[in-house]
């Protein structure tokens, strides 16, 4: 996917702790101002529980595609692939995610898919995560950063 914005036009923020409860709900709601697609990944290293299978089945109503991929924001595999689920990000899907998981980093097997990424309409990553490593980050354009800072998200810190 082509990203026409140069890296200097971005502000990079790394997650400090986790985005939990009402903050997670608000975060998913706010993200819709900039993002239209989300993705989650099925980890081959851990089977999904019955709850995880139900989570994935329910996600199908928002699904755009499922494709075996070797790369997504934050991860590059060598010699193998994982199923990557892309789904539309809207009020209903954001509500489903926030009801299904108590926090950003709780999106992981065995009860859920993992590595939530939120993508702008041009396909560039706004949020990336590697949940089993408890790592998440935002790559914001300057105007997005200004608007998001109005809410003062204390769960992220700047990095270069």
Residue ranges with predicted function:
Residues 1-160:
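Structured alpha/beta or helical-core interaction and ligand-binding surfaces enriched in interleaved
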